[in-house]
Amino acid sequence: MALFYLIIKHKNKKKRVKKIDRHKYTDMLTSLKNRNYLNAKMSEWEDCNVYPQAIVMVDLNNVKYVNDNYGHSEGDNLIIKAAALLVNTQLENSEIIRTDGNEFLIYLIGYSERQISTYCKKLTKEMKNLPHEFGAAIGFSMIEDSIKTLDDAINEATLDMINAKEDFK
């Protein structure tokens, strides 16, 4: 009887740990992975020897305007819709992470620069269909070999995204 109790106790503990991990790595608003997940995956992705890889950065436009003029719940609804759009247009071999309030990172493996560029253009077009002229600034960076680090690619994609944001204004 004591052995049975220990087995059940161990299984329950494993379930609790899984639930804690799920909450630790999941964004509560969008149900996407969060920054904690990104930080946990970075070294694994750095060790990946499959190329090309790409980082896509997405920054939603006009969130502050929507929050100020329509309320934070409307801003949250738009972020949820944008996250759903990202999931619905997600490519195979990719992960979508909400890194900040209105920013997302997409990590992709096995796509050419041309394919990533086409994907980003499609995302930009789709984001414009969201309410309140929401839109998004999107930038990307390719990792062709082990010389460029993920941090370098994230920085390059962020700069590309910032340039796209300037073009939006």
PLM-predicted stretches and their roles:
Residues S117-T124, K128, M142-K169:
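Catalytic-core segments of nucleotide cyclases and related cyclic-nucleotide turnover enzymes
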Residues I106-Y111, M142-E144:
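Short beta-strand-to-loop capping motifs
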Residues K13-D27:
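Membrane-proximal helical linkers
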Residues D21-Y25, N34-A54, N61-V87, I97-I106, ...:
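Conserved long alpha-helical elements within nucleotide-processing catalytic cores of c-di-GMP signaling
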